[in-house]
Every structure is written in C-alpha cells, then in structure tokens.
Amino acid sequence: MEQLCKRYVHTPAAFIQNIVANTKRTTLATQLSVEKAKKKVPKTALKKKLNSRPKERLPNWLKLNDVFNIHYEKPSNSDINKVNRFFNKAKVEFEWCAASFDDIPENPFLNKKSHKDILKDHGECGTTLIDTLPEVIFLGGTNVGKSSILNNITTSHVSRDLGSLARVSKTTGFTKTLNCYNVGNRLRMIDSPGYGFNSSKEQGKVTLQYLLERKQLVRCFLLLAGDKEINNTDNMIIQYIHEHGVPFEVVFTKMDKVKDLNKFKKKVMSSGLMDLPTLPRLVLTNSLTSSTSPKRFGIDLLRYVIFQSCGLIL
C-alpha cells in the first residue's frame, strides 16, 4: 500500500518536471530562432530595399565624355562633389553689360552701393581678390543654348527650374551685349552675343576684342549644338581662337536631341578638333530635361573644367 501511494505521489511530480524541462528547451529553441531571425531581417530587408530602388538611367552619349577626353585625367567623385557644392550654393550677381570693349568697367564694384558693402566686408584683401577674379567666356552661334547653359551651371543639378539668371529666349540672337556674372566672388562668367544669323558687326567686334585684349580671360568655352552640323562660321571661330592662342574648350549642347551617335562621332572626328595641338577638352551636355535625358547630364563635368581653368581646383 505504501509503495502504491509512492507511485501515485512521485509519478505526477516526475511528469511535471519532464514537462517543465521540455518547455524550457522549447522556449530556448524558440528564443534562439527568433534571435536568429532578427539578425537576418535587417540584411534581407535592406537587400530588398536596395533592389527595389530604381536605377538611374544614363544616356548613351554620356560615355563619350570619357572617350573624347582620354588624354585628360578623369576628375574624382570628391572633386566633382566639391565643385557642385560650390556652384549650388554660390551667390550669383549680374555685374555689367557692354556693347563695346571700352564699355567694360575696370572696377564694376566701385560704382554700386552693394558692391561697396562687399568690399567693406572683405577689407583690403577682399578688394584685391575681387578685382583679379578669373573670367571665362561662353561663345557660340545664335540660339545654341548659351544662356541655358549658364543657368544650368549656376543652379542646383537636380532642379528642373532653371531660374532667370540669364534670360532664356527662343528668339535667335537674344543676347545683344557682353553680360558679366560674378559667381561667389571666385570667378566671372561672360555671356557673349551669338554669332551668325541676326548678329551684327558690332557684336562680333566686341567679342573678338574681348578675346584678344581681356587680361582676366582664362578660358573660352565654344558651344556647338550636338544635333547640328559644324558650319563654316563655327570653323572660322575655331581657327581664329586657335591661331591667336586663346585657350578654349568645346561644349556640345542639346545632346539629348542627337538621334545617331555614330554619325555624331564621325562628325567630331572629321572636324579636326581632335587633331589640334592644344587638344581642347570636349564636354557633352543636355541643357534641358526630356524623356531621354531626365537630368542635366554633363553639367558637373563642365563645372569642374571651369573651376580647373580658373585655377580653383586644389
């Protein structure tokens, strides 16, 4: 009887202990599984998130910036980012316009109250820096997109609103004078009258005189429409600035409108640009956004070349 009682007394206890032990093991296994799952979730989620992010679509013509400039060192991403930050944040001011070379003021700041304030803020050192700013000029045929390029350079890379720094017009030859813009008190950009149709002799004279006599000029950027042929006037300008030793680069605009890239490459190779001893850099851009070019590609490289031309790349 005593043994029978012991049997009924101890059996439930052992049974309960067994259940508790199994429960602990099950709980521990579950916790380990949960912990393991938690560790995997972030990586899996991150991977899915990265894979779900749409890839940026790059136009095929953009690769030609590397192909045509193989003799130049490709700028680092760090340098590109620094230059982009400068242009995106720099204050841009219209300084002067000139219909003749004699109209170009030697000290444009001294005649304006706002500019006097700038000089006062910077002191004597600031005056020296401002008065010796390097200048780059943009040259091109009528309606080639000079003003649009200026807006692209001086506004945010991702912005579709190009602003009104340099007025854009569909009327050919809109820019009638040399227009000067101060960019962050580090450099000046000059927008010139377009040559060709609807241009005047006076406009051509002031531009050519500026190219030959302006001491502050460090680089000329010749703009050619990518979707058009290089005409006789373009070739005359190229020959002129080359023979007179004016340092220049070539910017192809409206590349998003180029339908046949092979034909475009043949055009460039047969133009003689690649054979010039000075070997100008060729920069391909699209100044306006479209379905084929949703961003303004090539502008970051153009900004870098401008900065480099002005001796501002450290």
Swiss-Prot record:
Cofactor: Mg(2+)
Posttranslational modification: Sumoylated upon ethanol stress.
Binding residues for Mg(2+): S147, T175
Domain (EngB-type G) ranges: 132-312
Binding of GTP, residues: 140-147, 173-177, 191-194, 253-256, 290-292
GO CC, alphabetical: matrix side of mitochondrial inner membrane; mitochondrion
A matching Pfam family: MMR_HSR1
Highest taxon listed in the record's lineage: Eukaryota
Subcellular localization, as worded in the UniProt entry: Mitochondrion
Gene Ontology biological-process entries: mitochondrial translational elongation; mitochondrial translational initiation
Keyword Ubl conjugation attached: yes
Assigned keywords, A-Z: GTP-binding, Magnesium, Metal-binding, Mitochondrion, Nucleotide-binding, Ubl conjugation
InterPro entries: EngB_GTPase, G_ENGB_dom, GTP-bd, P-loop_NTPase
GO molecular function, one term: guanyl nucleotide binding
Family to which this protein belongs: Belongs to the TRAFAC class TrmE-Era-EngA-EngB-Septin-like GTPase superfamily. EngB GTPase family.
Subunit organization: Associates with the mitochondrial ribosome.
Annotated function: Component of MIOREX complexes, large expressome-like assemblies of ribosomes with factors involved in all the steps of post-transcriptional gene expression.
Name of the protein in question: MIOREX complex component 8
